[in-house]
Amino acid sequence: MNRILTIWRGMTNGERVVAAAVALALAITVVAGAYALLKRPGDVSNPDVAFSLEEGAGKERRPKPRKTVNWTRFGYDLGRSKFLDTPRIRPPFRKLWKWQGEELIEFPPIVVDGRLYFIDNDGVYVALDASSGKVLWRKRLASLNASSPAYFKGVLYSVSLAPAQALAVRARDGKVLWRKPLAARSESSPLVLSGRMYIGNEAGQLLALDIDDGSTAWETTLGGSVKAGPAFADGTLYVGDYGGRMNAVRARDGKLLWQTSDLGTGIGGSGRFYSTPAVAFGRVYAGNADNRVYSFDAETGEIAWSFSTGDYVYSGVAAADTRGTGPTVYFGSHDRNVYAVDAKTGEEKWSEGAGGQVSGPATVVGDVVYASTFSGNATIGLDLGSGRRVFSYDDGEYGPVVSDAQVLYLTGGASVVAFEPIDVGSFRYETNKGQKGIVPPAQQRKAKRAARERARGVGSGDGPAGAGGSAGAAGGGPQGDRGGGGAGPEPGKGGARERPPPGGQGREPER
């Protein structure tokens, strides 16, 4: 220190000014570097965090080829894996019917006992016949909605943004059984089990309501607005908040079991969790507004890995374990890509350009992952193993598809479309413009004849079966299309709910 003072005293005033400026610049660089390290750490990889192949994502019994299943809640199962393991549902498809509405359907329907139930953005509840698309009943029960209902024993349980409420509605005819005013708006798709309805709200509360009358069993205040729907595994609810924390809450009594410090144990900075988490393999997976997807230990909250994309990740993560691909998580990003990442290590397996920004959930049905682009207004399907595009349909914005293991139901901007798998044999069909993996009606008879000939062992001479790879087939963008995401800051829809701003950025998600 004395030597430094001696040097300082020997300097001229001009030299002192220069030295002070250099020292200040160095100090700013060091502080900024330290801040960036805390605020924007590099991707984390912790191989010591527990991982189990015995927990979730494909461990439910695979449906028999001719058996339908019920998709009773957003995300399919209690862990919100967004994965239905069925061998039947794969392109090519034929269109069965299309129902066209007027308002945005931001969150996908649920499918129960031959009926589809959903709520549009204007709070209109709709029940459709799953075999025909015919409207069974339609009622406006709110003025603003952005969530899916949940079904349990003949009743639909739901929330709304305006008014701030929870509802129980009879599935048969839409009769309201009870209404519960909430302390703040909610777009948290409910989870119903053990006689309770679990939801979050913008006051930062996670609530358990009695399904018989809507009375509050418990409420727990978290670190910020809770917009995602909670996921469940082994007696615990998992949900992120707008304070940038992932939370584990005991379902029985609302006790907070663990809460990450901002973006994970030992990580500084903060981003918003809009993404509804998926719980599988002993881990919790969720996307964040800091452009990353995180994997946490479900028992302790310890961070296992983080994976950076080029823009916001509002997209809900799908977790699947299928033959040939192994445990993998799939998600979209505002950077216009869909990603497949090793569920254990966080290493990228593939990425594919989606042709637009993805805000809604990635959803896996069979061996295809589906995503919708709100800036491209389309729905795509990618092969789980390779990321190759096998399906395209020129409609879609947020929640892409659900299925009853016999039919695929696609959510367009304001429509619902039913697709049935079709055996084309060796017939090479031509798709309509903007589509891939969909056999046009005029060619379906030839396709069926080719399939019968194949079954009898007769060659058709039409060459190998096409998946719609002809003129007019939508081949999609090149792999790794990382065009500007530019989603802008947080969502907003006038004075209603927060959404990404207009001008190609679209509305705020689903998760």
Say what each PLM segment does.
Residues 21-33:
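Hydrophobic membrane-insertion alpha-helices, especially the h-region
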Residues 46-49, 58-95:
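Blade/loop signatures of beta-propeller domains
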Residues 72, 115-118, 156-158, 197-199, ...:
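Conserved beta-propeller blade signature
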Residues 97-111, 135-153, 160-163, 176-193, ...:
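Extracytoplasmic beta-rich repeat domains
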Residues 129-133, 170-173, 210-214, 250-254, ...:
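Short loop/turn segments that connect beta-strands within beta-propeller blades
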Residues 420-430:
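Short loop/turn segments immediately following beta-strands, especially the blade-tip
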Residues 436-511:
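Ser/Thr/Gly/Pro-rich low-complexity, disordered linker/stalk segments of secreted
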